[in-house]
Curated annotation (Swiss-Prot):
InterPro entries: Ribosomal_uS19 (IPR002222), Ribosomal_uS19_CS (IPR020934), Ribosomal_uS19_euk/arc (IPR005713), Ribosomal_uS19_SF (IPR023575)
Annotated source species: Pyrobaculum calidifontis (strain DSM 21063 / JCM 11548 / VA1)
One Pfam family named in its UniProt record: Ribosomal_S19
Keyword annotations: Ribonucleoprotein, Ribosomal protein, RNA-binding, rRNA-binding
Top-level taxon of the source organism: Archaea
Keyword Nucleotidyltransferase: no
Record family assignment: Belongs to the universal ribosomal protein uS19 family.
GO cellular component, one term: cytosolic small ribosomal subunit
Designated name of the protein: Small ribosomal subunit protein uS19
MF terms (GO), sorted A to Z: rRNA binding; structural constituent of ribosome
Length: 158
């Protein structure tokens, strides 16, 4: 195993994985009073009005070129998945806002070390992709004593 792969494995340890709600239970989903089907059929201008202010302002300014490229990848992947092919979508666009057309896909989001698979459910709509692929690990400190942490340097050695 190379050092880069070892780093990637270290990066995956300690991650909190959110519970995935199965698609059968998506019928109860509502976003600002709208069902998923209504959101999918809604024009982008109307959908933008439903978002919180930060996301609304970001989308009103228009998508960045890398976000447009990601949306093209997503649309292409959906076409291929309809034909029965398996497609992996990888991206570095952590600041992409999750749109209704992304629901049901697994997008691999880069966290600085490795790609973290994020299954997009309806409850993710309006959030950023980066919110679901944390960039830092949960720190698990060792026993207090010598060489543990800087704050425990003053514990007397036995």
């Amino acid at each position: 195993m190379s050092s880069k792969e070892a780093e990637a494995q270290k990066g995956k340890q300690g991650w909190i994985t959110p519970t995935v709600i199965p698609p059968e239970e998506w019928g109860s989903f509502r976003y600002r009073g709208k069902t998923l089907e209504e959101l999918l059929n809604m024009p982008m201008d109307e959908f933008i009005k439903l978002l919180p202010a930060r996301q609304r302002r970001s989308l009103k300014r228009g998508l960045k070129p890398e976000h447009r490229k990601l949306l093209e990848k997503i649309r292409k992947a959906k076409r291929l998945m309809a034909q029965g092919k398996k497609v992996t979508i990888k991206t570095h666009c952590r600041d992409m806002i999750i749109l209704p057309e992304m629901v049901g896909l697994t997008i691999h989001v880069y966290n600085g070390i490795t790609y973290i698979p994020v299954f997009i459910s309806p409850w993710h709509i309006g959030h950023y992709l980066g919110e679901f692929a944390l960039t830092t690990r949960i720190v698990q400190h060792g026993e207090p004593g010598l060489k543990a942490t800087r704050s425990s340097l003053h514990i007397a050695a036995k």
